[in-house]
Amino acid sequence: MPFLPEPLFQHGQPDRTAILLVNLGTPDGTSPREVGRYLRQFLSDPRVVEIPRAVWWFILNVLIVPLRSRASAHKYESIWLREANMTGSPLLVYSERQAHALQQLLNAQGHDVVVACAMRYGNPSIPSVMQALRKQGVERILVLPMYPQYSGTTTATAFDEVFRVLGEMRNQPELRLVKHFHDDPAYINALHQQVGAYWAQHGAPDFAHGDKLVLSFHGVPRRTLELGDPYHCECLKTGRLLGEALGLQPGQYLVTFQSRFGRAEWLQPYTAPTLEELGRVGTNRVDVFCPGFPADCLETLEEIAMEGQSTFRVAGGKEFHYIPCLNDSEAWIAGIADIALAHLQGWPLTLTHPHVLEASRTRAQSKGAAA
């Protein structure tokens, strides 16, 4: 197997450290063709759908993609950003803003770190971003998936792709991985501040009179829990820690799971039926927050803020509040920095002095080096 071409090496070039923020992915646009291409790549991953490949290939390519692409495209169109300074998929826009803000914060703190974001499916792809980092002289990469709770369906497949790309490199960089941060104080604090800021602006639920806070996490098949995936337990711990930080009693907040796909049983309770039941019993106000999504995306903006609100109100509920994800909030950028720096310990984070680099280049050239 031929290896990827290496960037031209130059003596005196600083060895740099990078943080690679990885998220799930998004289609390039809202056309059925673009959405279908994204769905095919996403759902072809054996980490995501554990069904015999031949059977699943037929289901995916003959049934799911042809039948779901147009409906999914309409959903993406409903949440696509088209503002002057925010254009495109919300997930990509906020991921890029997170990377940019983190870069600025770390640089302001005196750390010479390159920050980039990549998507497991779609663009910017992990291979393209990792190759771009190598061209910037990056010799050390901290892979930080934007999945607070570990799951084989998300975190592991991001690592798989990083390892695959690494295996194609002739001159491999050092690598560190952040497995999860579901109970990291920096993450819990950012969640706490996000909810608190929303309540300070819009008023808090009246928990004494039955209002509820629903913490909705992305669901996975229950079978993954039975096979040893820790995702369910980590979601519950995040929910408990956030509830405690907010000063809530168990019963004032609920942990639910959304985005069920197919007929198999997934982690319960399901979000949509929970919202329907809360509406049916006459709950006056429900606030929904999605702690497992550090950036707003289709699953939060369309499935929860739009469909979830409709489900609750049609069933008889009155006041529905969707609390935005962490996105590029100041507290969250500071939180990512804390998490990253804890995993970067021992790696050089300061830029080598130009005189030292020049001396290195001069010595190399005196020995016959071309550059």
Swiss-Prot record:
Pathway: Porphyrin-containing compound metabolism; protoheme biosynthesis; protoheme from protoporphyrin-IX: step 1/1. This is Ferrochelatase. It comes from Ralstonia pickettii (strain 12J). The lineage of its organism: Bacteria, Pseudomonadati, Pseudomonadota, Betaproteobacteria, Burkholderiales. InterPro entries: Ferrochelatase, Ferrochelatase_AS, Ferrochelatase_C, Ferrochelatase_N. Pfam families: Ferrochelatase. Belongs to the ferrochelatase family. Its EC number is 4.98.1.1. HAMAP family: Ferrochelatase.
